[in-house]
């Protein structure tokens, strides 16, 4: 009730104020207002002075007179076409589906022999079977000698690395004086230490990493 009365009185005061201001003329301020200068628009800049473009001559097609020839012509040899004789014998040529004289076996033998199968004075002379057998036996004998030397070198290396292992008496089946083969638990124990990689068949172990 009290609030409504306050609101009504406020609205009445606002209405009276509007009526009092409506009848009064607009009061001008004393003094003159400063003059407003006109808007100045700058003139446009002059166009840029570009240099004249280079003279490009028109495209002309080179024309030669009817009977003109170059002073230094390049020599081009004429094209040679390989001509085959019409109806000539072709018995010396081997077709892909044919085999040479002697059958497929002879052809395979020539391929396997390589340059030895060539005929003529440039072909190497074939050795007789006896000489070939002797050469093969000599080659196999030299390979056995090299294999034995390698085995002896490995045995010497094993003695140098593990002198205690090779100092015990008793043969090991080709150990060369004192080498013995480790068996059972002793062999497993040695295999766990120093990498334990066997070097040959007599049971010698490598001493790398000790």
From Swiss-Prot:
Coiled-coil annotated spans: none
GO molecular function, one term: peptidase inhibitor activity
Region described as Disordered: spans on this chain: 25-181
Keyword Transcription regulation set for record: no
GO cellular component, one term: extracellular region
Stored Pfam families: ANP
One BP annotation, GO: vasodilation
Ranges annotated as biased composition (Basic and acidic residues): 142-152
Protein localization: Secreted
Keywords: Cleavage on pair of basic residues, Disulfide bond, Hypotensive agent, Metalloenzyme inhibitor, Metalloprotease inhibitor, Protease inhibitor, Pyrrolidone carboxylic acid, Secreted, Signal, Toxin, Vasoactive, Vasodilator
Residues that bear Pyrrolidone carboxylic acid: 27
Pro residues biased stretches: 32-56
Top-level taxonomic group: Eukaryota
Family: In the N-terminal section; belongs to the bradykinin-potentiating peptide family.
UniProt name for this protein: Bradykinin-potentiating and C-type natriuretic peptides
């Amino acid at each position: 009730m009290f609030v409504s009365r306050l609101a009504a009185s406020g609205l009445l005061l606002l209405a009276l104020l509007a009526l009092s201001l409506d009848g009064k003329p607009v009061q001008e301020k004393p003094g003159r207002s400063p003059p407003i200068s006109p808007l100045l628009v700058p003139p446009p800049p002059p166009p840029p002075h570009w240099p004249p473009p280079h003279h490009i001559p028109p495209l002309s097609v080179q024309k030669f007179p009817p009977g003109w020839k170059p002073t230094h012509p390049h020599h081009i040899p004429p094209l040679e076409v390989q001509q085959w004789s019409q109806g000539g014998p072709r018995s010396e040529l081997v077709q892909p589906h044919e085999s040479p004289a002697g059958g497929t076996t002879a052809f395979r033998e020539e391929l396997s022999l390589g340059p030895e199968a060539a005929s003529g004075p440039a072909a190497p002379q074939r050795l007789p079977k006896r000489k070939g057998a002797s050469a093969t036996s000599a080659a196999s004998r030299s390979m056995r000698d090299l294999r034995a030397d390698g085995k002896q070198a490995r045995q010497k290396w094993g003695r140098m690395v593990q002198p205690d292992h090779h100092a015990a008496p008793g043969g090991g089946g080709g150990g060369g004086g004192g080498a013995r083969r480790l068996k059972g638990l002793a062999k497993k124990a040695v295999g766990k230490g120093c990498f334990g990689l066997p070097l040959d068949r007599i049971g010698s172990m490598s001493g790398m990493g000790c």
